[in-house]
Every structure is written in structure tokens, then in C-alpha cells.
Amino acid sequence: MSKNHVCMSSCLKIPSACLIFFCFYTIIILHKRYTYVFKRKIIIIFGLTLVSLLSHAQYDVSFSHYFDMEPSFNAASVGKQPKLNVSAAYAIDLAGFKHNPQTMYAGADMPFIFLKTTHGAGLQFMNDKIGLFTHQRLALQYAVKMKLFGGQLSTGVSAGMLSESFDGSKLDLEDSSDPAFTSSKVDGNALDLAVGLYYTHRNWYAGISAQHINSPLVRLGETNELKVDATYYLTGGCNIKLRSPFLTIKPSFLVRTDGVAYRGDITTRLVYTHEKKMMYVGAGYSPTNSVTVLVGGNVHGIVMGYSYEMYTSAINPGNGSHELFIGYQMDLNLQKKGRNLHKSVRIL
């Protein structure tokens, strides 16, 4: 998992003695994660290096297991199967570095029938911490589904709250009396909206979505503000059965952009299934960014996956990213009212 951008206004002043350390640390972190634009004056800490970083950063987090976490970027994918779906992921970026990015995600979704129409509902929470910044999102998701061309088309919306905070009290600066610099902890909230379309047809699927369509503006204290740009996603994948009835190849892709920066991921997994057992190995590639290896399987009905991402970009800190994924699914019988809706546990 690697991460990317934020647009923020602020004003800081860094003593020259700390400049070299902060510049080196910031270049490494921000190349993978965040870029900040400031309202009153540009922070000396970032210097001219931010000019190039501005074109390579995005706000949203990238997960290696995106194929099993589609509700995290497309609300229309909630309830895509007649199952209760629960997933969680924890990722450590730039392992070994102090204040390195750490992200936790948890979500659940399920379908339901209302007025003879299939709908989907979901809930998700994300906590993303990098350095002195903490980004949180709590959102509700809804989707309505209809049959189309032999498949199923789903239209979804999401409404949630972004919570942003910056703990300036932990910075060690000589000139903390500068009124333009935030030396205390500040936080703020803003409404966050998203929309999406998702289509499934037998052994393939495709989806398109837009996150942060209202471009949330979070005010942090009296002088700082953080603006999140809308981000657009395109995803797809399929199942390719091999001669062996136990083996399936599952290629998938995810492309996203905010109109300035972009990231693409291509992943292929070889999946072995037999009765209730499942194991997989896979590899992913993000052009100009990283190469990822994945491995996983199910244990007592719970799917566990691990991935390691190795950076291939010009600015390479030497340590990669670790990601752990956990998923659980339970079959639902949507046709029987007033009865126990679950039948059995299935693997992802």
C-alpha cells in the first residue's frame, strides 16, 4: 500500500538547523503520500521540491487488496453479492521510519430487498495517520440495483464525515512565536460525498466512481484550511478458469486521478479452491511507483491476506509497505422473510 495527496493552507517557519533533516524526511514521505498548498506563504521546510511533488500526489490511500475492498472507493459495489461482507485492512508504509504512514480500514456491507427491488447498504471507517497529521472518514453507503444486458447494474451514493487534525505542539521549532505558524493541535470536520456505478456480468465486472465530489474544505483553526479535491476511479476484473477445476486466474486493475495526479494498479492472482479451502498468490504492478507480491487463504471461514509493496520510483527510501487484509462473508437468503437469513460461511 502506498499513499498520496492533500491540499492544505497553513503557514510555518522552520529554523535552518532543521531544514536538511525535514526536507529529506518530507521528500520521502510526501513523494508517496501528501502534498500541501499553503494560503499565506509556502513553508520553507518544503522549498522547491514541492513544485515537482504537487504533480504526483493524491489524497486517498491506495490498498494492495483493492479488489476485495471496492466499497472503499465505489459506493455502488455495496451488496454486490447476496452475502454479508465484512473486511478490514491495516497497512504500514515506509516501514522503519519514524512517523511513517499507518492506515486502518474497516467496512461492512450487505444487500436487502425493498419493494421487490434489490438494494445495498454499507458502513465504513478509515483512520490514516502520517506524521503529525491524522485523517479520518466515517461514511454510510447506499446502492440500488437493476438487471441490465444479462448482468446487474448498481448505482450508489455515499455520505460521510471527514475529520482532519494536525498536532503542531509536537514540532520542535526555535521560532514558535511566529503568528503564521500553528504550534498547537487543530482539527476540523467537513461533509464528504461520493457517487458510483458498478456492473457485473457472469465472470467479469467494471466500475466507475467519484470520491469527494463536493471538494470538502476542512478548516483547521483560524488560519489553516485543508481542501480535498474530487478523485475519479475506474476499476475492472474477471475470472479466468483453467483446465484444472481448482485453479482460477483473477486479473484486476484500478486507475484513479484527481485531474492532476494519477495512479494505476494492475494485479493478477492465481487462486486455488477446493471445497471450503482457498489459497492464492499474486503480483501487482503500479507504473513508475511499485511492485507488489500478495499471498493469502482462508482459515475457518476467514480470509487472511498479506502483501508487500516494493517501491520502484526514483526516490526510494529503501523500506517498503506491509499490508494485512482480513475478510469474512456470510450467505444471506434474501427471499425468506422473518427467518434466519444466513446459511453458511463462504470465502471471498
Question: Model-derived features: where do they sit?
Answer:
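Subset of outer-membrane beta-barrel
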Residues: 58-348
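Cleavable N-terminal export/targeting peptides
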Residues: 1-60, 331-348
